């Protein structure tokens, strides 16, 4: 059995990065969490086959070092959406529409698209999704016996966090790092408490509604000293400093990409509607010509009096064009 270096304090993990990996883990994408340093591997099948062979060999030979992040099943995805709708949406018509979407094909993407048309529900979803994802991740880490602390939960300076990573396997460190390690040990115990999986609701009157301002989390640099050479090209290192950057979508990697898709989809829909309207208008003009309401006829009899102004404008324009042609002939 392989012997690995022993970390001298709980692993510093990024919960937002874990949320991203958990949401993307599916039948085509594998993510692993390292037990030694806490880094995440994303087995990208688009990499060179030689690199893939090496990393698969590393995973096989050191299977006890890496934990495969579980896949989100169809049932779990549906359950997440249903729970949100039943617990957080109060308008009956809106709730019925959401539940109808949940039962449809491609429910995950349709759910998000409909959600972004309802700003109030969107904010509630963001909070719900982050809270439920956090609980799911903590439960999984506990089941796999990780001793950890989420870096986003700490109030340490960036310098101290980076020094803790640099000296993760050093028994003797400075007094400052010794104190920081003790704080990490105490903090790590909180994640194994009952409250970590069952957060207590805040008591008292809810605060007044105000403009929502989300502060980005300050995180330290990624410092890993024990990454096997075969795994280095597969490190999963997205810079996620805000929960609003996360997305529940299975097709898009970031919230920005999903929103860009929605905006693009809106423009495409407008273009299609405009094309349909243009085709119908052309059909009406052809029909009017067949019925005798051509350019010399009185189009107002066919289209109605509301088009009189437009026809007058056309009549005003046509003589001008004729006059121009007349002048050209005169010059010749």
From Swiss-Prot:
Annotated TM spans: none
Compositionally biased residues, Acidic residues: 295-316
InterPro entries: UPF0158
Region (Disordered): 196-215, 291-332
Compositionally biased intervals (Basic residues): 320-332
Assigned protein family: Belongs to the UPF0158 family.
Name of the protein described by the UniProt record: UPF0158 protein TC_0713
Source organism per UniProt: Chlamydia muridarum (strain MoPn / Nigg)
